[in-house]
Amino acid sequence: MRTAVLSTLRPLAGLLLAAMLAGCGTQASQPSPTSSARPRSTATLSIVQPKNDAVVSATTMLVQFQLTGGEIVAQTSTHLTPNQGHIHLSIDGRLISMNYQLQQDVSLAQFAPGPHTLQGEFVAIDHAPFNPRVIARMIFDYEPSG
């Protein structure tokens, strides 16, 4: 009886294994609908101030961006428009502000002395990135005086 059951299950196990292996094919993954549905932007973003590798000694740093081909809008919406949005400013990967202007004073009081990465990203009016992303980044060295 046991031999009969095993001889019946072996072909089923083989079919199951073949089906599992077929599901693990080498097809290229498709982009997710979310990433392919993001609006495109032809805008470019650069950091005007501070300059790359600047040494900052004050506890407040003026950050100034230049945005070309895009428009800063002070609204949030799910009706996405290419090249309209605002700037997310981060230091060392930590979001500092969602900025609706091209310049702002940033407090450095909570940061340790040493090198830091400043990044600005021009994002759509729903706070999500464009596709491709519009990013500017630079390194500055924070050396507080006193």
Residue spans for each PLM region:
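Bacterial N-terminal signal peptides that target proteins for export
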Residues: 2-13
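C-terminal motif of bacterial Sec signal peptides marking the signal peptidase cleavage site
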Residues: 20-23
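Bacterial signal peptide processing site
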Residues: 25-27
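Short, compositionally biased P/S/T/A/G/V-rich stretches that sit at domain boundaries
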Residues: 29-58, 146
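Short amphipathic, basic-aromatic surface patches that mediate peripheral association
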Residues: 66-78
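Surface-exposed, short loops/turns at beta-strand junctions within beta-sandwich domains
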Residues: 109-115
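Short acidic/polar inter-strand loop motif in beta-rich domains
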Residues: 123-133
